[in-house]
Amino acid sequence: MNLAIDVASGEKPLEELVSGAISALQENKDINLILVGNEKNISKAISKTKYDHNRIDIRHTDEIIDMNESPANGIKHKKNASVLLAARLVREKEADGFFSPGNTGATLAAALTEIGRLKGVMRPPLISTLPKLNGEFCMLDMGANVDCTTDYIVQFAVMGRVFAKRYLKIDNPRVGLLNIGEEDSKGNANTKKSFERLQKMKKINFIGNIEPNDMLKSDSVDVVVADGFDGNIVLKTIEGTASFVVNLLKEEVKKNPVSVMGGLMMKPVFNNLKSKMSSDSYGSAILLGLNGGAFVGHGKTSGVGMKNAVLNMYKFLDAKINEKIAKELYDSGAKRRIF
């Protein structure tokens, strides 16, 4: 499997990202990498690592869409930007999927313009896995579509169900609609209408509304469906809360000598908690419903995050989730009505 990796974007040094990507090769012998960025810098970075020359290719470009740059402006004026070149490799069938830890808007735009949507998909959503007490659940949309119609939400539910079955290996995933209360009558006009539509879909194990405070419980839900505005807020709140709690505990521990002694023994627990909630642990969010794999990383993606992103790319593509989505949308009656 060939994976195109934009190592020129993001906030971490190129050398760290290259090292992380190459470390994934040691764990999966079926992965080949196409590293996109400045050839001289990439060659220098990989010369410091042990790797199989036959499994790594380099595609040179000096153009980068900066983190604070307008995605539309970058896509228009930088035709050979690293993220565009990586996505183009998927379109041209040289790669099965691409990953970028750079400008999120530019990554989404590159995926849509270069790879394109599956027939029947109205709006590709961003999906990601998140930890809960006894495992994982997935949530979509995480920010690709801020304004969503009921039709979009219904499609997200179908796509999320496919993802949970094939990626998380859950036979009959429970699908919940993110809302401000569990009652059927809760929510705005769009969530109420979405609730009614989802309740009528026999192929979906719809459990009703799910409140944000219930998502992380051990036995609550497997797929959380939301519009991109609410989904992105929930994601960032979870990440921020996890970091806050860990830092708060550390500050409390420092207040007296006895706590310091206990804190030293608890340090592995604190680090494990922080690691589980870190964006590096799940590597990337995935843009579903495309004619190829598109994976969006956090700007702060580290070498560890890059390694996990590459391994998760393989897991997703090997499960042929996008191919299954096209069939499920048609079978469920949630396909796009006008092509």
From Swiss-Prot:
Alphabetically, the GO molecular function entries are: phosphate:acyl-[acyl carrier protein] acyltransferase activity
Query: Signal sequence: where?
Result: none
UniProt EC number? 2.3.1.274
Instruction: Report the pathway entry.
Output: Lipid metabolism; phospholipid metabolism
Reactions catalysed, semicolon-separated, are: a fatty acyl-[ACP] + phosphate = an acyl phosphate + holo-[ACP]
**Gene Ontology cellular component annotations, sorted alphabetically:** cytoplasm
Q: Where's it mainly located?
A: cytoplasm
The UniProt entry, under InterPro entries, shows: FA_synthesis, Phospholipid_synth_PlsX-like
An example GO BP is: fatty acid biosynthetic process
The alphabetized UniProt keywords are: Cytoplasm, Lipid biosynthesis, Lipid metabolism, Phospholipid biosynthesis, Phospholipid metabolism, Transferase
By its UniProt entry, which Pfam families does this protein fall under? FA_synthesis (PF02504)
Q: Which SUPFAM superfamilies match?
A: Isocitrate/Isopropylmalate dehydrogenase-like
Where's it found, cell-wise? Cytoplasm
Spell out the subunit comment.
Homodimer. Probably interacts with PlsY.
This chain's function reads: Catalyzes the reversible formation of acyl-phosphate (acyl-PO(4)) from acyl-[acyl-carrier-protein] (acyl-ACP). This enzyme utilizes acyl-ACP as fatty acyl donor, but not acyl-CoA.
> What family does the entry list?
Belongs to the PlsX family.
Any idea what this protein is called? Phosphate acyltransferase
**Provenance organism:** Brachyspira hyodysenteriae (strain ATCC 49526 / WA1)
The encoding gene is plsX
